[in-house]
Each structure stands twice: as structure tokens, then as C-alpha cells.
Amino acid sequence: MSRTKRPHNIRKPAPDLIVIVTEGEKTEPNYFKKFPVYSIEFSVIGTGMNTISLIKEAEIQVEIQIDKFKEKYGEEPQETIVWCVFDKDSFSDEDFGNAINKAKAKGYKVAYSNEAFELWYLLHFHYYDMALGRDDYIVKLTEHLKRKYRKNDLFMYEILLSRQEKAIKNA
């Protein structure tokens, strides 16, 4: 039985590119970088910026990541998906709304938490429909984890992975 050979001039198409630009410099990137990602290029950039400045930085970072992609594959990605992740914090509704509108106008997706990314961690355990402050997040996470919550824990993704479906439903 002979094998069919693929012609040498047919190349596999370039994969997709996903860029996640976060407000947090460590907590969010530590979590997102643990996602099991195959057959796509995946980049997570923690900026320390928020709202409009984060969206502006995302524009810069997307161009940088596309340039890196082109160097690696010799062509543009099939699709570039951009996520901007930030906290609502105490920003005015106008600033917050402007950031979301600017991101959407660029075709970026937005994920935000009411006060801190740790709310996402809490949703792995319970549904919350009441206001919680940052200090409450830490106390509740410490209770659920049965150990002191450490903000920039490199293993938080692995710790929470078995509860990820619950978090998605609770979100």
C-alpha cells in the first residue's frame, strides 16, 4: 500500500493569535498563562494600567505580538483575538464606559470584575450576587482554600482547575 505524499509547496496555514492584556502585572498573567493552549499562539501581557490607558496599551501590544508572529510564521495570523482584562475599581462610570466602548470599537473583547480579579477565583466556589470588597475577597478565599490566600500564587490555576466549570456557571 503506497502512501500519498503531500506536495512540498503546500504549507499549513498559520495559526490564530490570542492576546490577553491585563491590568494586573502578576495575578491575572499568572492565571492566564497556565491555560492549556494548543495550535494557536497565545500571549498574556500584564500592564499595571487601567481603563482607557490599558486599551491604548493593548493597541501597542497587539502590534508587537503580530510582528513577533510574522517573524515566526512568515505571515499574518488567520485571526487575532484580543481580550482586555481590568477591574471596575473606583473609576467613574464614564471612564469605565469609555474604555469598554473603545475596546469594542477596536474589536477587542472585555472581561472585568467589579472590584478585583479575585472575584473570579471566588466564583470557583460559590455564586455571589452581593457586593463584596477587596478585603472580603481575601478572607473568603482563605476560607475556601483552607490556607492563606497569596495574591500572586503561581499555582492558582492548578488549584482552581477542577472547579472551573462551576466558576463559568457562576459568572
Question: What feature does the model see in each segment?
Answer:
Residues 3-19, 29-45, 67-83, 88-171:
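C-terminal accessory helical subdomains adjacent to catalytic cores in phosphodiester-
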Residues 22:
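Short, surface-exposed ligand-recognition loops at beta-strand->loop->(often short) alpha-helix junctions
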Residues 25-27:
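Short acidic, Gly/Ser-rich segments with clustered Asp/Glu that frequently serve as metal-coordination loops
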Residues 47-58:
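Phosphate/oxyanion-binding active-site loops and adjacent basic polyanion-contact surfaces
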Residues 58-69:
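Glycine-rich, highly charged phosphate/nucleotide-binding loops
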